[in-house]
């Protein structure tokens, strides 16, 4: 049977959505900003809602939707079932779950600590001040589409600007982009209008562009699990992918965390070594 559903997103005309809501749909799917618009207009009522699903919660928080989510949840009865999906569990997610979930059960699905065998993975230990020079060399020596990961939203803009100045056409992808701008950037990237994208972890979540041939980890991720997500952006559909990771001296601690995630036995050997030295 078909599911009666309203889709509430900012890039669509609100008049079309108002018509949908008048049909009293059982299911509402939408972005936090537009759902709030309808709650304020009173065109959407959630006082009888029994289920709420927060999908890609970490990405929504990274895009600044935390306050919007708070407002929405105030309209929903406390007696409800809440499902929260997130690829990572940063501190913000933990706080949100404690605030809104009652006796929650955590479910982890699939192995997250395995690098696909069809991805050629290279690690380069380097001084922080030499990273950009090495990046330019890597871009010169690599053909095809490239996805570069940096730590911050501001960093994506700065990096894309610097690369374009150095004759490497590139665009930033981060949580601050409006949906229409993100759609434009993604369309051009898929159409190979430019070959280099600079992204944050959250903004690139779920990115499925088959022709990405190389991933460059300019900065290490804040969460070890994101290392696997990054490498998964290349080598799609069993094609051969390539990844290179820059590791500066200040990032060695974080790199050790990533190695232990990939091979938990390293944790035991490290603890034995530290015990014998003490």
Language-model features, listed with the residues they occupy:
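Conserved helicase RecA-like core
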Residues: 1-278
């Amino acid at each position: 049977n078909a599911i009666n559903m309203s889709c509430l997103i900012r890039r669509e005309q609100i008049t079309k959505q108002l018509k949908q809501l008048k049909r009293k749909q059982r299911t509402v799917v939408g972005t936090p900003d537009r759902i709030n618009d309808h709650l304020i207009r009173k065109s959407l009522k959630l006082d009888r809602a029994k289920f709420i699903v927060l999908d890609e919660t970490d990405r929504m928080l990274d895009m600044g939707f935390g306050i919007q989510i708070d407002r929405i949840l105030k309209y929903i009865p406390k007696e409800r079932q809440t499902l929260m999906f997130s690829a990572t569990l940063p501190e913000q997610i933990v706080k949100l779950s404690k605030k809104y979930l009652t006796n929650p059960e955590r479910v982890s699905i699939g192995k997250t600590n395995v690098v696909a065998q069809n991805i050629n993975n290279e690690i380069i230990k380097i001084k922080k001040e030499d990273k950009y020079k090495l990046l330019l060399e890597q871009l010169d020596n690599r053909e095809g589409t490239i996805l570069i990961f940096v730590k911050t939203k501001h960093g994506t803009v700065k990096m894309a600007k610097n690369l374009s100045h150095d004759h490497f056409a590139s665009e930033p992808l981060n949580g601050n982009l409006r949906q229409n701008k993100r759609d434009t950037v993604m369309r051009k990237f898929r159409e190979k209008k430019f070959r280099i994208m600079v992204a944050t972890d959250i903004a690139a979540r779920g990115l499925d562009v088959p022709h990405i041939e190389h991933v460059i980890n300019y900065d290490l991720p804040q969460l070890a699990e994101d290392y696997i997500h990054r490498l998964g952006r290349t080598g799609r559909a069993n094609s051969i992918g390539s990844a290179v990771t820059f590791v500066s001296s200040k990032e060695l601690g974080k790199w050790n965390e990533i190695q232990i995630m990939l091979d938990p036995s390293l944790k035991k050997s490290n603890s034995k070594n530290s015990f014998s030295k003490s």
